[in-house]
Amino acid sequence: MIQPQSYLKVTDNSGARKLMCIRILGTNNCKYANTGDTIIAVVKESVPNMPVKKSEIVRAVIVRTRKEMKRDNGIIIRFDDNAAVVINREGNLKGTRVHGPVDRELWKKNFTKIVSLAPEAF
């Protein structure tokens, strides 16, 4: 569960390293975001000479959360960190690679390119 002011690790090669959530997109009164939700975030750390710069406002999709999530078949899944992937307004990735595992629920939310680029999907 990600809320405003939460820090997230970036798992693609767009140039950003850390994000801070500003707003959760979707509904008017949404307080928390889970895997597959789109957020608006500010870049807190970045790599020099890359497309995404520090203090830039970007959109991101959450791919991993520390909060455990129960699936319909009874399996509980939890990751070690909160992580996101930077996207543009159309929903396309800004980077070309995704590092680390991602949640399988991204298929259901039509982020199939993120799942196909990731090395593992749990």
Swiss-Prot record:
SUPFAM superfamilies: Ribosomal protein L14. The keyword Ribonucleoprotein applies. Keywords: Chloroplast, Plastid, Ribonucleoprotein, Ribosomal protein, RNA-binding, rRNA-binding. GO terms for molecular function: large ribosomal subunit rRNA binding; structural constituent of ribosome. NCBIfam families: rplN_bact. The keyword Disulfide bond does not apply. Pfam families: Ribosomal_L14. Part of the 50S ribosomal subunit. It comes from the Eukaryota. Binds to 23S rRNA. PANTHER family: 50S/60S RIBOSOMAL PROTEIN L14/L23 (PTHR11761), LARGE RIBOSOMAL SUBUNIT PROTEIN UL14M (PTHR11761:SF3). One of its GO terms (cellular component) is cytosolic large ribosomal subunit. It is found in: Plastid, Chloroplast. This is Large ribosomal subunit protein uL14c. InterPro entries: Ribosomal_uL14, Ribosomal_uL14_bac-type, Ribosomal_uL14_CS, Ribosomal_uL14_sf.
